[in-house]
Amino acid sequence: AGLPEGVFNVVLGAGETGSALVQHPDVAKVSLTGSVATGKRVATMAAETLKKVTLELGGKSPIVIFDDCDFDSAVNAALAGNFYSTGQVCSNGTRVFVHEAIYDNFVDEVVARSNGIAVGDPFDPETQMGPLVSQQQLDKVAGYLSEVRSADDVSLLCGGDTDFDAPLSGGYYVSPAVVVTDNEDHSVVTEEVFGPIMTV
């Protein structure tokens, strides 16, 4: 790219590598995209050397749908905002607020369309949603789904299946899930799942 040697470096590694970079006195700026817990640790370490810090931490990006919306476009936006890249995008709109006048119709339509999403091999042209990135991520998403299934104040309306027949068996697949709740404090409502779970 024409940059002088040492101007741009890519250093790969896990937490230990990140800690070394954050604590190093010659590093002037740290930018992190990650969890809230990791962000707190990075900010604390960076404060020791007064580094500039930019943090983009896990949370829920909202989609707000009013009763005067173009209904079909709103449903499409919610589906794309939740299930694009199997929900593994930081900016996915995974917390959907819907005006009460259209709430029931919206939920019914989202559930019907979610049930129709073709989950499969990303190389198959018929596939609309592929797998999660790893077993670790599948386990994390399955953990959220387990919490939802055991909660009295949260309802799983569709999806959340991880048991697929061959050739998908053994893969990191989960069907698109739609969850409804009034509990604003439940983990599936407040935390970034990074998987195909829409919360309405």
Question: Over which residues does each language-model region extend?
Answer:
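PLP-dependent aminotransferase-like
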Residues: 1-18
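Conserved beta-strand segments of alpha/beta enzyme cores
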Residues: 6-9, 153-155, 199
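Short, solvent-exposed loop/beta-turn-alpha elements that line the ligand-binding surface or hinge
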Residues: 189
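Glycine-rich nucleotide-phosphate-binding loops and adjacent flexible coil segments
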Residues: 196
